[in-house]
Amino acid sequence: MTQQFYVSPEQVMKDRADFARKGIARGRSVVVVSSLEGIALVAENPSPSLHKIGEIYDKIAFAAVGKYNEFESLRQAGVRYADVRGYSYDRDDVTARGLASVYAQSLGAVFTAEQKPFEVELAVAEVGENQDQDHLYRLTFDGSIADETGFIAMGGQVDSVHQVVAAGWASGSSLADVVGLAVGALGAGREPVVELDAANLEIAVLDRDSETSRGVARAFRRLNANEVNDLLSPRGSGSPAE
């Protein structure tokens, strides 16, 4: 007769958490940061087609680190949720907080009930009329959710990236300031330290005044290589905001 080994629930949860953390730590980092002109989403990502940053709804964007197939399925589910809710009720009823709550429930259910947890970490951002009304939510593999102020750093070298951004970010910083700061932080988080350029970056912006500047309600705008270089060239990446 085969002897069955007992594993405590605490040990099971610890093993799941360790497994997910190791998977996330292998991924390149992402920074989401608020600026005067909007919210910048900056990722180290050399792939031109496998995006880590995406649009969810009018003023809401998504960023992720970890396993691509897992966070891409969550992104698509978020788009469907937002479309259905906006169509069924009102477009103003689609909020980052509501989307983050749905993601938290899904991640928590997978973490506790499925064979393996998702190896992902998510950020949901919603741009407001001013910086005080910006909403940034960070979601971890177990469904935990945090309402962050100013910026979010995620991924493999999160401690060093977070330290650089925290030291340089200030409310009222320009878009060029925060993009340069985020890019510098991503490079500083690498071993050895590297200087990232447009070929290794994926950057998008949630424009605060998209209806005025571009005549559209959709705030999300993905930057091309020329736009990235224009943002980085005046300051040089990694300069702290003044």
From Swiss-Prot:
Principal localisation: cytoplasm
PROSITE patterns the UniProt entry points to: PROTEASOME_ALPHA_2
Q: Which InterPro entries match?
A: Ntn_hydrolases_N (IPR029055), Proteasome_alpha-type (IPR023332), Proteasome_asu_bac (IPR022296), Proteasome_sua/b (IPR001353)
Is Cytoplasm among the key words of this record? yes
Top-rank taxon:
Bacteria
Record's keyword terms, sorted: Cytoplasm, Proteasome
Q: Where in the cell is it found?
A: Cytoplasm
Give me the Gene Ontology terms describing cellular component. Answer: cytoplasm; proteasome core complex, alpha-subunit complex
Pfam families membership: Proteasome
Matching Gene3D superfamilies: Glutamine Phosphoribosylpyrophosphate, subunit 1, domain 1
Please name the GO terms that the record assigns under molecular function.
threonine-type endopeptidase activity
Activity control, as annotated, is: The formation of the proteasomal ATPase ARC-20S proteasome complex, likely via the docking of the C-termini of ARC into the intersubunit pockets in the alpha-rings, may trigger opening of the gate for substrate entry. Interconversion between the open-gate and close-gate conformations leads to a dynamic regulation of the 20S proteasome proteolysis activity.
Pathway where this protein functions: Protein degradation; proteasomal Pup-dependent pathway
Q: Where is the signal peptide?
A: none
Query: Which GO biological process categories is it annotated with?
Result: modification-dependent protein catabolic process; proteasomal protein catabolic process
| Keyword Amino-acid biosynthesis recorded | no
For this chain, the family text in UniProt reads: Belongs to the peptidase T1A family.
Q: What does this protein do?
A: Component of the proteasome core, a large protease complex with broad specificity involved in protein degradation.
Subunit structure, per the record?
The 20S proteasome core is composed of 14 alpha and 14 beta subunits that assemble into four stacked heptameric rings, resulting in a barrel-shaped structure. The two inner rings, each composed of seven catalytic beta subunits, are sandwiched by two outer rings, each composed of seven alpha subunits. The catalytic chamber with the active sites is on the inside of the barrel. Has a gated structure, the ends of the cylinder being occluded by the N-termini of the alpha-subunits. Is capped by the proteasome-associated ATPase, ARC.
Could you identify this protein by its name? Answer: Proteasome subunit alpha
Organism whose genome encodes this protein: Renibacterium salmoninarum (strain ATCC 33209 / DSM 20767 / JCM 11484 / NBRC 15589 / NCIMB 2235)
